[in-house]
Amino acid sequence: MGARRLGRELALQMLYSRDYAAGEAAPLLELVLDESEPGAAAGRSFADDLVRGVLEHRQEIDTAITGASKNWSIGRMARVDLSILRMAMYELLFRSDIPKNVTINEAIEVAKKFGTEDSPAFINGILDEIASTLPDKG
């Protein structure tokens, strides 16, 4: 598994856990990271960036998700799906070094692993809607 995929999976676990536990996300990283995993250091760094970015820009991210999710309030979304969407939205809006299609594809792959059967299509629909309104990166 690549370092960024590992980072996304770690970030998802931290964001999901943070929704249910008050406090900082950093201690959660220690619980979900296997230091022996290849790419662990780079994955940790990327996960940390994603989590901090989502937390810093959460209001703007949630506003964008709400605008693109027809008939779905954030409160009705599955927590795993919402955490994946928040991560991907941070990448789409604030990480110019990651192409839009990579962000969307990675979010779908993470959703296949951690979400429900319907999660990949749900996440793809919302991210495609948002990505179509954003300028190309590069």
From Swiss-Prot:
Record carries keyword Chaperone: no
One Pfam family here: NusB
UniProt keyword annotation of Transcription regulation present: yes
Swiss-Prot/TrEMBL GO biological process terms: DNA-templated transcription termination; transcription antitermination
Keywords: RNA-binding, Transcription, Transcription antitermination, Transcription regulation
Family: Belongs to the NusB family.
Organism expressing this protein natively: Geobacter sulfurreducens (strain ATCC 51573 / DSM 12127 / PCA)
HAMAP family the record matches: NusB (MF_00073)
Record-given protein name: Transcription antitermination protein NusB
Function description: Involved in transcription antitermination. Required for transcription of ribosomal RNA (rRNA) genes. Binds specifically to the boxA antiterminator sequence of the ribosomal RNA (rrn) operons.
GO CC terms in record: cytosol
Gene Ontology terms for molecular function: RNA binding
